[in-house]
UniProtKB/Swiss-Prot annotation:
The lineage of its organism: Eukaryota, Metazoa, Chordata, Craniata, Vertebrata. Pfam families: Lipase (PF00151), PLAT (PF01477). It comes from Homo sapiens (Human). Inhibited by bile salts, is reactivated by (pro)colipase/CLPS. This is Pancreatic triacylglycerol lipase. PANTHER family: LIPASE (PTHR11610), PANCREATIC TRIACYLGLYCEROL LIPASE (PTHR11610:SF147). The active site is at S169 (nucleophile), D193 (charge relay system), H280 (charge relay system). It catalyses: a triacylglycerol + H2O = a diacylglycerol + a fatty acid + H(+); 1,2,3-tributanoylglycerol + H2O = dibutanoylglycerol + butanoate + H(+); 1,2,3-tri-(9Z-octadecenoyl)-glycerol + H2O = di-(9Z)-octadecenoylglycerol + (9Z)-octadecenoate + H(+); all-trans-retinyl hexadecanoate + H2O = all-trans-retinol + hexadecanoate + H(+).
Length: 465
């Protein structure tokens, strides 16, 4: 996969200036589609027949086996497509295919939370070629999706505002093309790590941009430059809301060795894909998990990821934080501006959802050198222990830290404190936490107190005060 992304950028053939197709209109190789710095080769997309865009419909009635549908009244009427439901198209990227497990898995998670028409768009006929050619073929894919959306509107009175197009990699730009052709009337487009090569820095006409739908949200997971870092995704903001989980460049869990990747539980193919492009693929895995974790991917507005990791962007502002992924459209300020940036951390494996807390500990007892940890207990669950501070522990001093729990503990009922000495201390000092304040990302605070002190490695339970 890696050589195809890089070397195929250098391959291509000189084509004619324009080609036209009855249903989809004309396609040119003039600027900005070709002949610009980011895409110097003059290449036309392949024909609709060669790209062979297919629409694979899953619904709540057929969650496991798709029905292939077309922009045809009898095809739609003879399927499980329901006009009183939202329709979510999912478009894969380079070398991928519409029958790949991840697309169906998105649909299956959707069926857990809503009744929906879930259409996986297969264009493997145009994706399994050199990258430069595939980057042109997405124009055909976008045109086919736009034609399908317009057909639903004309034949069934189905509003484009009820359409959501989700695209990964090159599929994100295909979604943008569909949106451009429908004049921005599509309700929502979600770009899952939109492809960088041939798109970063190009005019809006070529790539995904906020004007392509009423609402455009983007997840960036592989934003390092393609040269020399082989980052496949864009770092450029291209939506109303742009999320940069873990900074948007290196995703946790993506540095496993090749053997552990290939013998992954997902199988040899999925494991090999993960090794070749793990960061790039994380975007659709985050989206899949977000569907069943409606509050587990809060994105914080922040100047940069470095500022975020310095604990300077918590809690959420008065307008709240958007949720990265499926529920981003619930954010009240989603279209207040374009290029709004948000940062968050995720887990290193599914379930990727995390819940961020700020914990402030006021110490009591003796002055010692060591480190302190706190665990949270709530009405929804309990967290593991997280380190709050390491260094000199002084009575009446307060130390704060933020951490991302893999459990949403809900309303807190108690906290537990423990400390460890960094050196052997024969005096057996005792340290306690006179007060611990826990703050959630929405600014809700819980206060806990204890008059006790404990020796190292002994748990101290604090109750509400």
């Amino acid at each position: 996969m890696l050589p195809l992304w890089t070397l195929s950028l250098l391959l291509g053939a000189v084509a004619g200036k324009e080609v036209c197709y009855e249903r989809l209109g004309c396609f040119s190789d003039d600027s900005p589609w070709s002949g610009i710095t980011e895409r110097p080769l003059h290449i036309l997309p392949w024909s609709p027949k060669d790209v062979n865009t297919r629409f694979l419909l899953y619904t709540n009635e057929n969650p496991n086996n798709f029905q292939e549908v077309a922009a045809d009244s009898s095809s739609i009427s003879g399927s499980n497509f329901k006009t009183n439901r939202k329709t979510r198209f999912i478009i894969h990227g380079f070398i991928d295919k519409g029958e790949e497990n991840w697309l169906a898995n998105v649909c299956k998670n959707l069926f857990k939370v809503e009744s929906v028409n879930c259409i996986c768009v297969d264009w493997k006929g145009g994706s399994r070629t050199g990258y430069t050619q595939a980057s042109q073929n997405i124009r055909i894919v976008g045109a086919e999706v736009a034609y399908f959306v317009e057909f639903l509107q004309s034949a069934f009175g189905y509003s484009p505002s009820n359409v959501h197009v989700i695209g990964h990699s090159l599929g994100a730009h295909a979604a943008g093309e569909a949106g451009r052709r429908t004049n921005g009337t599509i309700g929502r487009i979600t770009g899952l790590d939109p492809a960088e090569p041939c798109f970063q820095g190009t005019p809006e006409l070529v790539r995904l941009d906020p004007s392509d739908a009423k609402f455009v949200d983007v997840i960036h997971t592989d934003g390092a430059p393609i040269v020399p870092n082989l980052g496949f995704g864009m770092s450029q903001v291209v939506g109303h809301l742009d999320f940069f989980p873990n900074g948007g460049v290196e995703m946790p869990g993506c540095k496993k060795n090749i053997l552990s990747q290939i013998v992954d539980i997902d199988g040899i193919w999925e494991g090999t894909r993960d090794f070749a492009a793990c960061n790039h693929l994380r975007s659709y895995k985050y989206y899949t998990d977000s569907i069943v974790n409606p509050d587990g991917f809060a994105g914080f507005p922040c100047a940069s990821y470095n500022v975020f990791t310095a604990n300077k962007c918590f809690p959420c502002p008065s307008g709240g934080c958007p949720q990265m992924g499926h529920y981003a459209d619930r954010y009240p300020g989603k279209t207040n501006d374009v290029g709004q940036k948000f940062y968050l951390d995720t887990g290193d494996a599914s379930n990727f959802a995390r819940w961020r807390y700020k914990v402030s500990v006021t110490l009591s007892g003796k002055k010692v050198t060591g480190h302190i940890l706190v665990s949270l207990f709530g009405n929804k669950g309990n967290s593991k222990q997280y380190e709050i501070f390491k260094g000199t522990l002084k009575p009446d001093s307060t130390h704060s830290n933020e951490f991302d729990s893999d459990v949403d503990v809900g309303d807190l009922q108690m906290v537990k404190f423990i400390w460890y000495n960094n050196v052997i201390n024969p005096t057996l000092p005792r340290v306690g936490a006179s007060k611990i304040i826990v703050e959630t990302n929405v600014g809700k605070q819980f206060n806990f107190c204890s008059p006790e002190t404990v020796r190292e490695e002994v748990l101290l339970t604090l109750t509400p005060c």
